[in-house]
């Protein structure tokens, strides 16, 4: 910040000549090289500090104006160097503005008593009428948010986390609103109690109230026409445009909200895209997408999710209130017109069709199709493993991560086959085998939690699950062999056992329990240490995965150790399974091409990409 000095008598006279006025000229201080001739028709109240006016400011492509202040009323404002502030219809009150900013054609910008800037806001996701289970603050990421949602029912844990976050917020809380460097704010009506970081742009917004925009040189925030944001935080690289209205929300890195989308008490992380529709009490983890006006995401936890048009969830039984909620695990989709009656839990990479009743819980039958046909509910386990859609999804997500490397607070593990999803597959395969054993082979259908599994679908489900298991084991072993041809057993048992998915972070449950223990015992003393712990676990993912997979391979093949001979057999099984997988996907593509409206070039390009999969076998 500049060292400011009082105005000289000559400077005051120039300012008066330019129709400027001050309540008290002795309360106006300026930088050493201040030039008064670049201020016109400015009213000054309270304590004012003004920087230099040495540069031009680009107001539109190829159109520059000299920095200065014109047609504005300022009260208790500090302005950095080389800003252009003009045509302020009402006033700027209680604000600190950085260097090289362009602020034009705004109505009001002020900080009032009790400003929070959106920090520390406690919202209730999933359970719409809950007591609050996510605290919004600038350093929030998808892992910490998911951790809070999962563990806040533990009152001791909730209080510990709240205290850590409160300390973090108190240490960073400014005494008044802040505008960073290189910020552009134009054609905007009202900005109240906001912190707007470096390189952000606000263009045509209606109202920003108690918000923080976390822009940086690596990822600016853009707020567009007609937008209203209240009590919210918007992270680096995010854009909120075209009359979006959000309340009590966190918008994460590189998220896009557009075209009249509305949301309340919801969180969005890492490349999520929301357009036209609505969200309420929704936890939208990495790569959650909803494009359609008629779609409502309510009371659900999602990640790597795509909502078809007219998707709806029922969180209200019209008895005790809108308190029901559900989880659609990573990779799930809902087709056009899909409806899901909460509470419900869908396994990884599931696809929903129609009006699904009976509160399905298919966590241990992942990659399933759930289909409503009138009042009959069908479950097709493992079907999604061999679809074009899954193949395209797992290829596209890593390419669509728009976050700068410096702005990746949320951890995103893209593995579609992992100890988490493969653990579900193992349980699913056993469930199907048990159903077949108990009911027998001479039936046309099986029943699982009021969902019908056609006999042919059960048999194919076992087959598809086994294909996925062999692909997974072979892929992990192939990676290990490249760095360790001797196939050394894991040095630690950490990773053996159940796994969890904390909204993008795949981790052993034992490690998550360790975090819970350390937070309660005070070993984790601040938010930075907690976030670092998630990063540390992610950095050890391959070691944990190897410990889990080594045990899984031994169990699957009935061996006690993995020899090179075993490795050759596993690799052969891997190649066969992978080729079967690709062949099934090719059939799925051919079936769609036969419908007649897929361009041949598109089909051929896709088939060519399948042909290239053989390159990844060794």
Spans of features found by a protein language model:
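Polar low-complexity intrinsically disordered regions
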Residues: 1-2, 163, 172, 199, ...
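Phosphate-/polyanion-interacting regions in eukaryotic proteins
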Residues: 68-80, 84-159, 186, 532, ...
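Long, compositionally biased intrinsically disordered regions
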Residues: 373-618
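A charged, amphipathic alpha-helical module
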Residues: 163-180, 185
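Glycine-rich hexapeptide-repeat left-handed beta-helix
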Residues: 9-10, 14-24, 30-53, 57-69, ...
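Intrinsically disordered, low-structural-confidence terminal and linker regions
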Residues: 1-9
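Core alpha-helical transmembrane segments of integral membrane proteins
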Residues: 179, 183, 187-202, 210-221, ...
């Amino acid at each position: 910040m500049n060292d400011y000095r009082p105005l000289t008598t000559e400077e005051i006279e120039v300012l008066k000549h330019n129709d400027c006025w001050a309540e008290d000229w002795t309360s106006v201080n300026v930088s050493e090289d201040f030039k008064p001739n670049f201020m016109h028709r400015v009213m000054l109240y309270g304590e004012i500090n003004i920087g230099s006016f040495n540069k031009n400011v680009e107001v539109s492509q190829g159109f520059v104006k000299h920095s200065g202040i014109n047609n504005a009323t300022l009260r208790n404002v500090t302005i950095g160097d080389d800003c252009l502030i003009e045509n302020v219809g009402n006033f700027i009150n209680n604000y600190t503005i950085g260097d090289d900013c362009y602020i034009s054609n705004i109505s009001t910008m002020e900080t009032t008593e009790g400003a929070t800037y959106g920090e520390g806001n406690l919202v209730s996701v999933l359970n719409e009428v809950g007591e609050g289970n996510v605290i919004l603050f600038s350093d929030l990421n998808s892992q910490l948010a998911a951790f809070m949602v999962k563990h806040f029912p533990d009152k001791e844990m909730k209080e510990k986390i709240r205290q850590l976050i409160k300390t973090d917020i108190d240490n960073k809380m400014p005494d008044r609103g802040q505008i960073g460097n290189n910020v552009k704010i134009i054609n905007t009506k009202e900005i109240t109690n906001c912190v707007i970081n470096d390189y952000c742009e606000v263009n045509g917004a209606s109202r920003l109230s108690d918000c923080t925009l976390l822009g940086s040189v690596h990822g600016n925030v853009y707020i567009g026409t007609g937008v209203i944001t209240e009590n919210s935080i918007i992270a680096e690289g995010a854009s909120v445009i075209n009359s979006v209205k959000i309340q009590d929300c966190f918008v994460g890195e590189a998220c896009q909200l557009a075209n009249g989308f509305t949301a309340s008490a919801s969180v969005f992380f890492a490349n999520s895209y929301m357009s036209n529709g609505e969200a309420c009490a929704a936890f939208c983890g990495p790569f959650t997408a909803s494009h359609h006006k008629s779609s409502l995401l309510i009371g659900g936890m999602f990640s790597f999710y795509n909502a078809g048009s007219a998707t709806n969830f029922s969180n209200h039984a019209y008895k005790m209130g809108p308190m029901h909620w559900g989880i659609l695990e990573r990779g799930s989709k809902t087709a056009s017109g899909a409806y899901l009656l909460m509470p419900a839990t869908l396994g990884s990479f599931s696809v929903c069709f129609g009006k699904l009743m009976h509160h399905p819980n298919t966590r241990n039958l992942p990659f399933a199709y759930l289909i409503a046909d009138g009042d009959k509910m069908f479950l097709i386990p493992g079907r999604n493993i061999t679809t074009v859609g899954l193949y395209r999804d797992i290829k596209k997500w890593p390419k669509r991560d728009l976050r700068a490397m410096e702005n990746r607070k949320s951890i995103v593990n893209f593995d579609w086959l992992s100890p988490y999803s493969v653990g579900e597959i193992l349980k699913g395969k056993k469930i199907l085998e048990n159903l077949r054993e108990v009911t027998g082979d001479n039936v046309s259908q099986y029943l699982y939690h009021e969902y019908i599994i056609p006999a042919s679908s059960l048999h194919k489900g076992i087959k598809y699950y086994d294909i996925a298991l062999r692909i997974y084991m072979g892929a992990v072993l192939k990676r290990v062999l490249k760095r360790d041809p001797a196939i050394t057993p894991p040095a630690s048992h950490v990773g053996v056992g159940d796994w969890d998915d904390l909204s993008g972070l795949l981790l052993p449950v034992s490690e998550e329990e360790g975090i819970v223990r350390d937070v309660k015992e005070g070993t984790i003393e601040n938010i930075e240490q907690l976030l670092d712990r998630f990063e540390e676990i992610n950095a050890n993912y391959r070691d944990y995965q190897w410990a889990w997979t080594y045990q899984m391979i031994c169990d699957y093949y009935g061996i006690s150790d993995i020899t090179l001979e075993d490795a050759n057999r596993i690799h052969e099984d891997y190649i066969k399974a992978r080729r079967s997988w690709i062949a099934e996907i090719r059939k799925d593509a051919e079936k769609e091409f036969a419908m007649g409206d897929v361009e041949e070039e598109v089909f051929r390009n896709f088939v060519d990409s399948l042909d290239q999969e053989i390159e990844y076998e060794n």
